[in-house]
């Protein structure tokens, strides 16, 4: 293993460097720096004593180092520091919060040039300066140093924070109060640890290629679903918590019911296939993502304008997919040739669309749980527990009419017990007194919604989450003596509840640190690698075209696409009607916040500007 490389910046009397050097093993390389020149430290006996100790230990000491220009100090071969420390940074004298924010911003940007890929930046701040909820008490945002927002300018996120203890660094003496040889209060001080964030990728969607017979077709990834297609969370090699919770659920039900797992690898549906689905909620269709397949005669290497992915097994059972036809010369339809061949399809909004295919096969096994699992996609409003893409498991049970009530009750009882067991594993014993799961009978008197209390997120959270549904059906055309029960489960919400993951977007992160939280065979509360990300708020108001109307669902979908899923809230503020023209204006408030990446105020301003352009173009509104 390569030796660790540590960098200390902004040292005053070098007492922190001297104390830290005593705790390090011989393989660790320490570089201690300060802004002052040696002559400026000549009047400080403690500084000279510490410098002498450092030199005796072979520590690299450098003077006149500006922590905001680290790339100018270290050659390329000297960089790649594993840890960079800045202990109680300040601009000196009576500098206000604005000056100290500027210092932090430039420091973090400078760190990005010399920090190792998996390195850490440690910044100790006095009580309240950081402006995060970890500070007790927490200062108002405008009166703090806004350390997390400043770190974002350097592409860094806050990954840990804990109390700074002088006792843990024996011999350290803080100094520099108002640029004097005076100490300052460090009670309640915090050490903030920052790590590199994944960068925001360009908004160019990936291009997917699929094969129909001998012909390749392509389509761009919907912008509102960037990073959501073809992730393979449920596939064999995956150790994703969504797969873990699905396997646990299936295994427990398998102790009571015989199981038959069905292959479900295609989330695309042909347009004509959506009209023959008796179990389809009409709301699904209005919220579906519709896309067009286009003939693609290029090879995958020659595609431009996006990342190409060949997904032969991923998308669709293409024997059911029909191309759009052109009228032939004899009045019959014939398929378009060349690049005019295309098909209108939608991304599957629910696994219920496959029910008909499953229950109508002649060899359907009565009394067995038939299981489908896969991703589904729906346009939706931007809300904390509503997601445009999630993984669903569908249990299909066919039973004799005479046994319906008993089998249904048995299934619900066992499912309730399994869910209660899973959902209470991360709760303290005092919270396990009552069931978290309720089956709420619907107005039709036969179907149920599966509701769960959300104590896992916060004791103050009183809203129940709907994590699934139970649908009972009449007999099928082929199996007239049977009735059917369909249990649909939102695996993403279930995983969030089990592991206390408060933000659904974290399940889709590309950051490898996410999966390191999950140990096989154990369920422990999730710890995010990005703490206290800052929020940025922007308002937008616009005149609507009253003839064309205003589609609020599409408004949310455009916001999701433009912001790359960084908008966490859209709040309707007001409606205004001009007294003379009768023209109507709407005003909304958008809140931006990421869960896993560094997001700057400048990036948000750019997104907001682009959002105004997009809604004008696609929703026929006139921004004010």
Curated annotation (Swiss-Prot):
> Which parts of the sequence belong to the FDX-ACB domain?
531-624
Entry GO MF terms = rRNA (uridine-N3-)-methyltransferase activity
Gene that produces this protein: FDXACB1
Q: Which GO terms describe its biological process?
A: rRNA base methylation
> Where are the annotated coiled coils located?
none
Protein name as annotated: Ferredoxin-fold anticodon-binding domain-containing protein 1
Pfam families, per database record: BMT5-like, FDX-ACB
* Superkingdom as given in the UniProt entry: Eukaryota
Disulfide connectivity for this sequence is none
Output the Gene Ontology cellular-component terms. Answer: cytoplasm
Lineage runs: Eukaryota, Metazoa, Chordata, Craniata, Vertebrata
């Amino acid at each position: 293993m390569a030796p660790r490389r540590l960098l200390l910046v902004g040292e005053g009397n070098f007492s922190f460097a001297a104390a830290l050097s005593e705790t390090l093993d011989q393989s660790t390389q320490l570089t201690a720096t300060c802004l002052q020149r040696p002559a400026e430290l000549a009047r400080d006996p403690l500084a000279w004593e510490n410098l002498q100790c450092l030199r005796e230990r072979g520590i690299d000491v450098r003077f006149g180092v500006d922590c905001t220009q680290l790339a100018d100090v270290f050659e390329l071969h000297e960089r790649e520091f594993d840890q960079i420390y800045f202990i109680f940074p300040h601009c000196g004298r009576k500098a206000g919060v604005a000056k100290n924010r500027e210092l932090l911003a430039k420091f973090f940007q400078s760190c990005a040039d010399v920090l190792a890929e998996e390195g850490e930046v440690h910044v100790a701040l006095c009580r309240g300066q950081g402006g995060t909820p970890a500070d007790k008490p927490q200062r108002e945002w405008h009166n703090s140093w806004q350390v997390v927002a400043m770190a974002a300018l350097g592409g860094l996120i806050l990954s840990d924070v804990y109390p700074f203890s002088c006792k843990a660094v024996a011999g350290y003496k803080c100094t520099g109060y108002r640029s004097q040889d005076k100490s300052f209060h460090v009670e309640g001080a915090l050490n903030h640890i920052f790590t590199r964030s994944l960068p925001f990728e360009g908004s160019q969607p990936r291009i997917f290629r699929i094969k129909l017979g001998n012909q390749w077709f392509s389509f761009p990834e919907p912008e509102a679903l960037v990073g959501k297609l073809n992730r393979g969370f449920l596939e064999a090699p995956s150790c994703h918590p969504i797969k873990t919770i699905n396997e646990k659920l299936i295994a427990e039900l398998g102790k009571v019911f015989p199981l038959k797992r069905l292959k479900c690898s295609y989330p695309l549906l042909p347009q004509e296939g959506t009209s023959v689905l008796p179990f389809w909620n009409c709301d699904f269709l209005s919220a579906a993502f519709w896309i067009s397949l286009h003939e693609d005669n290029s090879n995958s290497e020659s595609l431009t304008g996006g990342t190409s992915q060949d997904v032969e097994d991923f998308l669709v059972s293409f024997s059911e997919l029909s191309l759009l036809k052109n009228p032939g010369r004899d009045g019959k339809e014939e398929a378009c040739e060349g690049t005019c061949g295309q098909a209108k399809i939608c991304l599957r909004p629910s696994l219920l669309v496959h029910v008909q295919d499953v229950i109508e096969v002649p060899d359907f096994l009565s009394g067995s749980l038939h299981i489908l699992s896969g991703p589904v996609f729906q346009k939706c409003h931007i809300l904390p527990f509503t997601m445009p893409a999630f993984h669903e498991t569908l249990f299909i049970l066919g039973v004799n009419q005479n046994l319906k009530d008993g089998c249904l009750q048995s299934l619900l009882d066992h499912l309730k017990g399994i869910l209660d067991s899973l959902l209470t594993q991360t709760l303290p014993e005092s919270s396990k007194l009552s069931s978290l799961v309720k089956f709420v009978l619907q107005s039709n008197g036969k179907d149920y919604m599966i509701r769960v209390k959300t104590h896992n997120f916060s004791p103050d959270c009183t809203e129940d989450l709907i994590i699934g549904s139970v649908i009972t059906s009449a007999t099928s055309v082929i199996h007239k003596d049977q009735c059917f029960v369909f249990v649909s489960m939102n695996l993403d919400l279930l995983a969030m509840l089990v592991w206390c993951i408060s933000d659904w977007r974290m399940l889709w992160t590309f950051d490898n640190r996410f999966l390191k939280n999950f140990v096989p065979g154990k369920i422990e509360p999730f710890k995010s690698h990005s703490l206290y990300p800052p929020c940025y708020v922007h308002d937008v108001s616009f005149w609507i075209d009253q003839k064309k109307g205003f589609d609020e669902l599409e408004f949310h979908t455009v916001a999701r696409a433009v912001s790359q899923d960084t908008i966490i809230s859209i709040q309707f503020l007001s409606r205004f009607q001009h007294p003379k023209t009768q023209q109507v204006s709407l005003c909304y408030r958008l809140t931006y916040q990421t869960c896993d990446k560094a997001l700057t105020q400048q990036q948000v301003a750019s997104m907001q500007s682009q959002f105004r352009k997009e809604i004008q173009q696609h929703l026929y509104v006139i921004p004010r």
